[in-house]
Amino acid sequence: AGSVPLIPGVEGLASRPFWTNETIFDMPDLPEHLIVLGGGPIGLEMAQAFHRLGSNVTVVEMGQPLRRSDPVHAAQLVSLMREEGITILDHHKAIEVKGGQNDLTLIAEGPDGPVEIHGTDLLVAVGRTPALDLLELDRGEVDSDRNGIVTKPNLRSVSNPNVWAVGDIAGRGQFTHLAGWHASIFVQAALMKLPSKAVTDQLPAVTFVDPEIGQIGLTEAEAREKHGDSVETVEFPFDEIDRAITDRQKTGSLRLVIRKNGKILGASVLGQAGGEILQILSLAMANKLTMRDLTKYMSPYPTRAEIVKRAASKHFQPKVFGPMAKKLVGILQRIP
């Protein structure tokens, strides 16, 4: 079943030609001015791609772009894309579309009132929705909601034990890697009768722009709401990583959200090959490794992934080089 592009109820949109992430690769010619409706991962990926191919691009987002990402990194990325020449109108709600192919106007309501954006093509990229219409769930008495089929933690339907849901229709996210993981959960639970849970509190997500931005676990705000003052953050910049300096790709940083006991609650990375670096944090969180554990492995030099160990080491610097540590060293040095 999978998912299909979500089409918003903007006045005039249904009767006008537009592209989605499924059809845009059928575009016969490079658009002169592409209007992108939606500032999420798909919208920003396509916006940057078409801008670099030579199109003028305007992104219209009703809220904050990449609102599910770390807000610090998301804001930095938006700033970089604007510096590149991409127009990004955040907090602008699309209210009407006029005209047609090669001559269209999108009207959006912004903080300072309505604005008109004129373009040649429109890409609708406000998200995707589970494709449930053809499944006839009512006939099978399968409960569902706007996110997909309602399941137990092992992906089995809560209302029909003969039905299992994996991938985009399982209501836990829409990622290729998540669907693959769901398949392994299904095999364990349905075929091997092993206890399995498709928890998604450690779901890694990467937006493949340049530089990449990736997120896993809780953001700082989410962590503080859940754990209060026991939350700390550690940030380490790429401009202090020798491989990044050598490659002249120093933009961005790694941000870790942790508890004072060293438990890793979340991580965000902005930088070249950020998705590769997020792999380490995904493995660490899945196996409940702590910040101390991240200081114990040997990282090859020079690599960009060294930033993980450097960030973990930075967390312990106040304890290692603080007043108490210096006092202890002084005492030990006086011992004959």
Language-model-detected regions and their locations in the chain:
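Short loop/edge segments at beta-strand edges and connector loops
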Residues: 1, 20-22, 90-92, 98, ...
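Rossmann-like dinucleotide-binding cores of NAD(P)H-dependent redox enzymes
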Residues: 25-26, 31-35, 41-113, 173-180, ...
